[in-house]
């Protein structure tokens, strides 16, 4: 739903239900549910982006469709005149009407562009006066920023991929070092406009490619669904073929291509260096899934409602076919192929991409003495939010990219940032992961009934768990006063073990990571999840 129609009986909605590929504007009768289509993209290319209303007439004054750049279709001639007046004064900027006085005589207007993170204005409708109120990031020198342009290229199967390319300002745009920056999601998209990372990398001398690979949103159901079950396959081809296109155009130097991204972009980074190991000369993977099976097993409780969507788009781990697909599409399965210099960045408290996703790939590389740089911030989650952590990561990443791709980097950093960088830098040889643990000692036998004791809030709680072990793997069932649960993905390496306790507590399913070590008749370790934090435990046999 968008808002009520002025008759207060119908509701404006956006929908692509049925045979419609694109999201359209429609009206739904609140009583009968009958839907009447109002408008879809006149060019038939993208989903509905936004609908603007007059708060006086309650009528639609404009609709917007975000193609390569936004396209605006006016329904009110006076509003169109105001828009064009501002557009003619400010040039190639995107204009957004934020709010107005009750009589709509004065407007707060914001503008953005590829070289302007944002400026806010006061527009007087009667006088036509346009007054600057403030700039976002006012200390940023706009004159040194690099322009972003729209490109399109064909992927491996001929599908056209929309993308954005930022070329360093002042360069001739030829034979440049390139950094591919895939977006996260992956069910999201990049837009034309100001991009912090694109500008930072361009400032350091790199061309920056931001592809909207299949599976990205905004381009209709067919384009979105074309990414179903294509992680690491055609979705990755869409990125690879973008690199090839820029090399063929003479823009990118094939010997100086890097890839950097976070979340799904981090997955694409790891996929790039495992599935196309000869393509990249440097890679920075930020909060990156390395194992699709363990990624889905660690879905946080507040995502439980969309688990079925993940299974549809990524494969169902509860079927043999789904498990094989996930193994095939997981970069961890091919870690031995990696020959690209790699930096891995992780937040220790990430509820979406668990730390073990990074630990697994780092441990796999360390086990064969392959050099990898690893940063772990203990006070971060899915991405870095604290300025000192972000600055430390950027300082490390730009030095790393410069070393392998030849761009510039700032050698100096504040003592605070330098200290923090030292604190979050992890020696890969100290990283342990159940999937890559090289401990060859016989697996301790965990089979049987156990009493786990945890202390939470000053009170002791007992959990009874019965474990069934088969070689180096185990499953189990739990029971406590709080609820029941099942043990899944249990792994034993020597005396060390990890597992997921999928607990049913007060009608909610919570995945809790269980890590520890065991003797014949005792265990100790930790339960951890975003919902409960970190809770140490001890355990003994329940005889």
Predicted feature residues:
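Peripheral, non-catalytic segments that deliver or gate enzyme domains
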Residues: 1-162, 167-174, 190-204, 245-248
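Conserved hydrophobic/aromatic positions in well-ordered beta-strands
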Residues: 26, 61, 121-123, 164-166, ...
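Extracellular/periplasmic ectodomains of large secreted or surface enzymes and adhesion receptors
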Residues: 56-57, 62-66, 72-92, 99, ...
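Glycine-rich His-Gly loop
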Residues: 65, 112, 181-186, 263-266, ...
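Short coil/loop residues immediately preceding or within conserved phosphate-binding loops
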Residues: 148-150, 160, 254, 326, ...
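Short substrate-entry loop that stabilizes the transition state in hydrolases
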Residues: 171-176, 181-220, 354
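Active-site-proximal cap/loop segments of hydrolase catalytic domains
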Residues: 211-444
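Central antiparallel beta-sheet cores of small beta-barrel/beta-sandwich binding domains
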Residues: 442-543
